[in-house]
Swiss-Prot record:
Cellular-component GO terms for this entry: cytosolic large ribosomal subunit
Assembly behavior: Part of the 50S ribosomal subunit.
BP GO terms, sorted: negative regulation of translation; translation
Task of the protein: This protein is one of the early assembly proteins of the 50S ribosomal subunit, although it is not seen to bind rRNA by itself. It is important during the early stages of 50S assembly.
Any one Gene Ontology molecular-function term assigned to this protein's record: mRNA binding
Coiled coil location: none
Protein name: Large ribosomal subunit protein uL13
NCBIfam families per record: rplM_bact
UniProt keyword list: Ribonucleoprotein, Ribosomal protein
InterPro entries per the UniProt record, alphabetical: Ribosomal_uL13 (IPR005822), Ribosomal_uL13_bac-type (IPR005823), Ribosomal_uL13_sf (IPR036899)
Secretion signal, residue range per the UniProt entry: none
């Protein structure tokens, strides 16, 4: 028996929507990264983009456990010597683009390279409850029901 290898033309990509309200950031990010890569499918092939298109809504209502909201820092470099800026998760979540916390969490769980960039293109994160992808008829996935640790009352 030969090892099965999926061809890009054979892959059927689904659209899924996940409501992040009250979900723990890290646990949500691991499940989303698995979906984006296609590792939840029996036809998973490492060199083919066989993952789903994932839509995350209510990203600004995702929660951290412990004191990570105040203590976790995100760094960025401006390009000038000595200009490394840092912001806490709380500052980002209360700022203009709260969806960046989830985007960064998922991005850091995806391999870096050409295929990883394509897979990250299949992720759409929105801070509020609305998204413009109703025409794709996305399937709703309830992450909270998978494990009681996936949610946190905050």
């Amino acid at each position: 028996m030969k090892t099965f290898s999926a061809k890009p033309a054979e892959v059927q990509k689904k659209w899924v929507v996940i409501d992040a309200k009250g979900l723990v950031v890290g646990r949500l990010a691991t499940l989303v990264a698995m979906r984006l890569r296609g590792k939840h499918l029996p036809i998973y092939t490492p060199h083919v983009d066989c993952g789903d298109n994932v839509i995350i809504v209510n990203a600004k209502h995702a929660v951290f456990t412990g004191r990570k909201r105040e203590q976790k820092t995100y760094y960025k470099h401006t390009g000038f010597v000595g200009h490394v800026k840092e912001r806490t998760a709380r500052q980002i979540l209360e700022g203009r683009f709260p969806e960046r916390v989830l985007e960064k969490a998922v991005e850091r769980m995806i391999p870096r390279g050409p295929l990883g960039r394509v897979q990250m293109g299949n992720l759409r994160v929105y801070g509020g409850p609305d998204h413009p992808h109703e025409a794709q008829n996305p399937e709703k996935i309830d992450i909270a029901k998978l494990n009681r640790k996936n949610t946190r009352a905050a």
